A protein has these predicted regions:
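N-terminal leader/targeting and accessory segments in enzymes
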Residues: 1-87, 91
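Walker A (P-loop) phosphate-binding motif
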Residues: 89-100
Length: 100
């Protein structure tokens, strides 16, 4: 993945974040999280990744996107994490010029 700046991501998802970092990976599962990635807390039928946000930071996530404030964690808060993921994909795709 090409690098994205957290400031670009925050703007794309209509959120705020006061730290800057280059993101080269996005994770939705702390079991496969790599240091420096962006963790997005998705909710499923049997899980809520918001429960794992502190663990994501412990494992080295550069930032997290959540749908609510998490105690002792500075996150980018949005209304819908799935929409935020879509908006990031749109931002990323627009960085490239396709060959036709």
């Amino acid at each position: 993945m090409e690098k994205l700046l957290l400031s670009e991501i925050a703007k794309a998802i209509n959120s705020q974040y006061h730290k800057e970092a280059e993101i080269t990976e996005i994770c939705t599962d702390t079991r496969s999280l790599t240091e420096g990635c962006l963790f997005i807390a998705l909710k499923g039928e049997r899980f809520d990744a918001h429960d794992f946000v502190p663990k994501a930071f412990e494992l080295g996530a550069a930032a997290c996107i959540t749908e609510k404030e998490i105690e002792n964690c500075e996150c980018m808060v949005v209304d819908d994490c799935r929409k935020a993921l879509k908006d990031i994909a749109h931002l990323y795709r627009n960085k490239f010029t396709p060959f036709l």
